[in-house]
Amino acid sequence: MIPGNDPILLTPGPLTTSPATRHAMLRDWGSWDAAFNRMTQSVCTDLIEIVHGENEYVCVPLQGSGTFAVEAALGTLVPRDGRVLVPNNGAYCARIVKVLQRLGIAHVELPLREDAPVTAAAIEDAFNRDPRITHVAQVHLETSAGLLNPLDEIAAVCKHYGKSLIVDAMSSFGALPIDLRRGGIDALVSASGKCLEGVPGMGFVIVRRSALEACEGRSPSLALDLYDQFAYMQKTTQWRFTPPTHVLAALRTALDQFIAEGGQPARGARYARNCAALVDGMKALGFETFLTADVQAPVIVTFHAPRDPKWQFAEFYAAVREAGYVLYPGKLTQVETFRVGCIGSIGTNEMHDAVAAIGRTLIRLGIRVK
């Protein structure tokens, strides 16, 4: 447990935040105040620097969850006659398909197994089969299982074929290396409440300036128009509509801690240690991972559920919650699984303690794993 006896959130976001991040939300901010506007700009500057986009990219923050930002990116950046390829190996890829359907944007779905990352060859084949494809909407880290898709290879093939790549980096931004200097990526979407260890409530799109400047009047939405949001901020330094002031203040503090920790390499290394501690401990209890180690991202791990007839996830979840650890409820894979996150303001001590709590819960409920 963290100070105050709050539970540890072993989820991919919202997640356990530091006391300093929570404390940052105790101050009220005026949404048109110059100090708040400077804070917005400083946050955007840092977000761009994390992915090395200083020269060609701009950051557009947006009120709401990460999905709001994904929908804003698709609705703004894809023209009316565009056609989007969506490699689909999980629930968040499927959500992109649903967004495109609602927006009335033509798209091609590339179905994949839940445990199989997309390959550059598969995307190249899709381009050759359908030359009308103009864009690719790619989830970097498919959080439904913790599957890592090979972003650099995908970006390279998109660049080679002249296709625009929009990346959902919701659960990878800040934890895994992303370098926009390599080219091939037009837009990168993430949110405050994931690996940056802020709180939920703000998405953002880091987008190539030249791509965004060609999008005036394209979005079918007022609130989710990235071009208007950016143009208004450039003109006034303010948000178009009421900003999530406390969320932004928390993110500013979270970014300060991110930088002090050593940036993405250090954050990613801590999460990797957490993941290793979790996997080793769960395997010692008899659990098996859903993914192989070579495609497992150090953010959330999916485990096969025990075959013991006494296993009931709801009962298991409640018992682990009572012990002070909140797992991710429910499964998103087709087979019977459950997920445990390893990100947030936690370290290996918390992971070891969580595994011990899970072990005690299994004994208490009389569940055999092996």
Swiss-Prot record:
GO MF annotations in UniProt: 2-aminoethylphosphonate-pyruvate transaminase activity
Residues annotated with N6-(pyridoxal phosphate)lysine modification: 194
GO BP of this protein: organic phosphonate catabolic process
Keyword set, alphabetical order: Aminotransferase, Pyridoxal phosphate, Pyruvate, Transferase
Gene3D superfamilies on file: Aspartate Aminotransferase, domain 1, Type I PLP-dependent aspartate aminotransferase-like (Major domain)
E.C. designation(s): 2.6.1.37
Endpoints of the signal sequence: none
Cofactor(s) required, per the database record: pyridoxal 5'-phosphate
Catalytic activity line of the entry: (2-aminoethyl)phosphonate + pyruvate = phosphonoacetaldehyde + L-alanine
Pfam family, one: Aminotran_5
Subunit description: Homodimer.
Family: Belongs to the class-V pyridoxal-phosphate-dependent aminotransferase family. PhnW subfamily.
PANTHER family recorded: 2-AMINOETHYLPHOSPHONATE--PYRUVATE TRANSAMINASE (PTHR42778:SF1)
NCBIfam families, A to Z: PhnW-AepZ, PRK13479.1, transamin_PhnW
HAMAP family in the cross-refs: PhnW_aminotrans_5 (MF_01376)
Role of this protein: Involved in phosphonate degradation.
Name this protein carries in UniProt: 2-aminoethylphosphonate--pyruvate transaminase
